[in-house]
Amino acid sequence: MLNCRNLSKKFERTLFNKLNINLEKGEILAITGPSGCGKTTLLRCICGLEKLDSGSIFLNGKEITDSPAEVRNIGLLFQKPVLYPHLSVSGNLSLASRDNHDKALIEVGLSGFGNRDVYTLSGGEGQRVALARALLANPRVLLLDEPFSALDSDLSLKLINDVRALLKSRECPAILVTHNIEEAELFSDRILNLLDSIN
């Protein structure tokens, strides 16, 4: 499904070097490491927001290394949900698709939230809206950049379980980056420590 070969990137120092990642259909990988080690940069390279120094990325057997981000069909969920406060929940979902809003909101546990103002949402609700929007675009892979870290522990645990179950039911492969090893163990099928990729 997603095949990353010999990915390398450095700024003042090496972030990752000749890193290989293979992700099968429905598989969830967690990438761990301390803050500032390059986890977010890796996700940005995979989805096309940053350039690699070297290496190749394949999706369903097709090379996408030099493809623009908008044609890769890779979803990205951030630590802080990127929502537009002047739009309703449904208005935010319309940025991904004009259809199936009710179904998407039911899927993420927010039935009936379509007409809500975004500024009235809690942190967990906002993250669920961002997830619904990402999934409405039917991404071939979903990348998650510490989406649970800003939530309290009980809310974070529920969201981890709900998002994992949803991704598994859709057979959507995903990569989570986190510095929290417990979170990684709960959410993923396997774990990669990014520091291990630096040779």
Locate the predicted segments by residue:
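Catalytic Walker B motif of ABC-type/P-loop ATPase nucleotide-binding domains
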Residues: 142-146
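Conserved ABC ATPase "signature" region
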Residues: 100-113, 119, 164-168
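Conserved ABC ATPase signature
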Residues: 117-121, 125
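Helix-to-loop junction immediately C-terminal to a conserved catalytic motif
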Residues: 47
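Hydrophobic anchor residue at the start of the ABC signature
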Residues: 131
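ABC ATPase NBD coupling module
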Residues: 63-80
